[in-house]
Amino acid sequence: MFNKHSVEIDWGGRPLKLETGKIARQADGAVVATYGETVVLATVVAAKAPREGVDFLPLTVDYQEKTYAAGRIPGGYFKREGRPTEKETLVSRLIDRPIRPLFVDGWRNETQVIATVLSHDMENDPDIVALVASSAALTLSGAPFKGPIGAARVGFVNDEYVLNPTLDEMVDTQLDLVVAGTADAVLMVESEAKELNEDIMLGAVMFGHRHFQPVINAIIELAEKAAKEPREVTVIDNAALEKEMLGLVEQELRAAYAIPVKQDRYAAVGKVKEKVIAHYFPEGQEPKYDKLRIAGVFKELEAKIVRWNILDTGKRIDGRDSKTVRNIIAEVGVLPRAHGSALFTRGETQAMVVTTLGTGEDEQYIDALSGTYKETFLLHYNFPPYSVGETGRLGGTKRREIGHGKLAWRAIHPVLPPHHEFPYTIRVVSEITESNGSSSMASVCGASLALMDAGVPLKRPTAGIAMGLILEDKRFAVLSDILGDEDHLGDMDFKVAGTESGITSLQMDIKIEGITEEIMKVALGQAKDGRIHILGEMAKALTNARAELGEYAPRIETFKIPTDKIREVIGTGGKVIREIVEKTGAKVNIEDDGTVKVASSDGEAMKAAIKWIKSIASEPEVGQIYDGTVVKVMEFGAFVNFFGSKDGLVHISQLASARVQKTSDVVKEGDKVKVKLLGFDDRGKTRLSMKVVDQTTGEDLEAKDKVAEGEKAPREAAGE
């Protein structure tokens, strides 16, 4: 019944098995990849006919984690998986980025890749397994895919690279780098690093590339057994049409791409397009070509003119040479009520970045496949349509926004202070107010400034830069701080973020094969020069974190109480802690180990809350005087609440120095009194006294009498 085929190899000391022919047999391609005991099913289905009216590759990649893979049931009312989590979105992009450039030009059939995590062994992260499985499924599917690709995760521990570190090993690594590519070239890199230098980062990329070669060979071996016949793609020869169009508009198009201002340039290019449309689609005549074909050829001309100009003259669209960074203006403290804020402008790209400091109540609860945890650093990236002069629908967060936000998060995360030293929940929001390339790196620069403006003690300021590449035969140009057009028309998008000491984040997407180690080395070196320049411009606004937190930011005090006192501080059903919060206005968070965090922007409120909590958690001392409140009046005395939640009895004989007939003659419920702790009776009940305390000044009358007697005794002994 099953026509099974499988290949198994040892990869990094663990077995990797690829199997097809048993599960999801109606998909064009389906592979179950097993690494250790982590299992991922990847399927590929491509439509039989091209999608009408599109001039792009209609590819969709979906990565999904099933909670049963970890032996768990989803939370929530419905008890089933909901919308994609942040990790699912990020891994979907991680798979999409290296496979998209490898489809044959002209493939317009709807293609969907679905990677489903079926089992997770809590050691091997499913993302790499999903990438490998997706590559294998595409290779078997018959889709025009110029793969296969391999992928690997690289760690760096004790000055040595580690292949596919386990989740436990990731705790100690200085590097988390994912690299994917073909047998000959690297296509994608995604990483976070603890300020590592360029040589270590490049070495990690090449280490990963070498070590995923056995995976590529295994996929090829499986394809030889089970691959479908490749589907044909009709490729139209546009050489003659391109030559004709070039003769028609070359001069105008070159002139348009010499205009440095984006909106003016787009207007000029628009007029050239109108000329092309008027020429090829004259009114009243049957057109010779369809509009998509003309638009595609025009786009090719745009790319060639921009690329030739850069390689031939060294001049870019806006007149810069390949290494120059656009003009930068950095400002901090731009929003009066925000805890920290910055406006970072680089050419026609601008980010307004805002930092908000919160408490433990604001931590994000993450219910991940590998377990639940709390996230104390959040970075959100928003890209509204007005930033590029367009209208658009505002709605849910898009995949691109999630991806760019995570890239900026990775750049900043390594320089944050440890949470035990700076016990705040930190949220950074980057609002892209203008965009013409490199908005994610503007977010990194703005985030660094906004955090320092808020008083967050970063290890060092952090900056980011986006690099591009133009490669024609053996000629190439690496471009610093690319524009949006240079991103679209170039061969590489290479984002590098870090401090003056090293790289904290590296993301690379390459659209062509043939990027050599030499080119990557040049790009990294040029990126370092650009990063140092940008850090210098940022320093004109702020060089280090402010000594004090923002005026409106909460202050947090941390202290410990005995664990057996936690229940008393919280109270039945949270009654006591709610009262503390309501009456003082401070926020209180108590952890299982007895760590208490009290937060408030009002210093007096914080002091009151701390005093209240400590009074509950501490034990009163015999002989000390305390403020109290009469809570109950009885015939034999009064019960007084003191020292937080403690209650004690003032016997009728201890109410006043004179004889008291009725307790109510001296006190009534609600009276504020001063009491001295005399001790405890045989049953452990607290004994208090009012008569030995001056109810006005709080002075200990008993102690005063003893002092007086002590002074009197020597005089009597002398015969006075």
From Swiss-Prot:
The EC number(s) attached to this protein equal: 2.7.7.8
Compartments, as annotated in UniProt: Cytoplasm
The record's section on Pfam families has: KH_1, PNPase, RNase_PH, RNase_PH_C, S1
The family database entries (Gene3D superfamilies) matched by this protein are listed as:
GHMP Kinase, N-terminal domain, K Homology domain, type 1, Nucleic acid-binding proteins
Provide the GO MF annotations for this entry: 3'-5'-RNA exonuclease activity; magnesium ion binding; polyribonucleotide nucleotidyltransferase activity; RNA binding
Please tell me whether the keyword Amino-acid biosynthesis is annotated for this protein: no
Q: What is the lineage of its organism?
A: Bacteria, Pseudomonadati, Pseudomonadota, Alphaproteobacteria, Hyphomicrobiales
Q: Which residues bind Mg(2+)?
A: D487, D493
The cofactor required is: Mg(2+)
CDD domains, from UniProt? KH-I_PNPase, RNase_PH_PNPase_1, RNase_PH_PNPase_2, S1_PNPase
Q: What is this protein called?
A: Polyribonucleotide nucleotidyltransferase
Extract the HAMAP family matched here: PNPase (MF_01595)
In its UniProt entry, the species of origin is given as Bradyrhizobium diazoefficiens (strain JCM 10833 / BCRC 13528 / IAM 13628 / NBRC 14792 / USDA 110)
UniProt domain S1 motif: residue ranges: 623-691
Reactions the enzyme catalyzes: RNA(n+1) + phosphate = RNA(n) + a ribonucleoside 5'-diphosphate
* UniProt function note: Involved in mRNA degradation. Catalyzes the phosphorolysis of single-stranded polyribonucleotides processively in the 3'- to 5'-direction.
Q: What is its main location?
A: cytoplasm
Annotated ranges, domain KH: 554-613
Q: From its record, what is one biological process in GO terms?
A: mRNA catabolic process
A single GO cellular-component term on record: cytosol
